[in-house]
């Protein structure tokens, strides 16, 4: 006996129960991503190549779509800093992100990479304190610092150093990263970009480059997997994602 199966493709437009505006918003948010084929067209599509195609194409075209307008005042509601610790060929990464009022969007405010080779914990803490002071001087707000939860010794050292500086109050705002699924983090940023709710400032150049060059690995067919072989800047991506991952539901209205 031979068993056969048929996969039926069901586009989202074939579902009459969904509100038209909901469908329109979903199409906008998923444009340019693998999720458009999967969730809008009802087609299975392997995740390959550039992850954030909209941003990469925008930077190549020089249209400035993802940069906050220079003539528009920016008033962050919350400012958060993400920290990823380097090692084994990777680098320390700091990213400051603004959450806009009502979770209406996010802005990459500033980012920095630090080479950890031949450096100690004090060197890392010094650079992070300098970064935090610059962010606070510019925006007058730091709600939290979210750090890679795998490095508790470094986190405790950062807290101790913060208590001895001008930003001593910030020591009690150092938290562990939530580390939700990487694919959920990717989908969150895709939704923000597609929905016109993601921007960058020039000071976030390493974040810009990390996002624009992020790739799917393509090593395991049928598996969504981000390339992490040292050829792309995963450290900065992680640091950025730590700043927004806890608000996945708020930022996606789910």
Each model region followed by its residue ranges:
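Hydrophobic/aromatic beta-strand patches that form the interior of the parallel beta-sheet core
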Residues: 6-8, 81, 146
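ATPase catalytic-site recognition across NTP-hydrolyzing enzymes
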Residues: 15-86
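Short, flexible active-site recognition loops that position polar ligands and cofactors
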Residues: 222-234
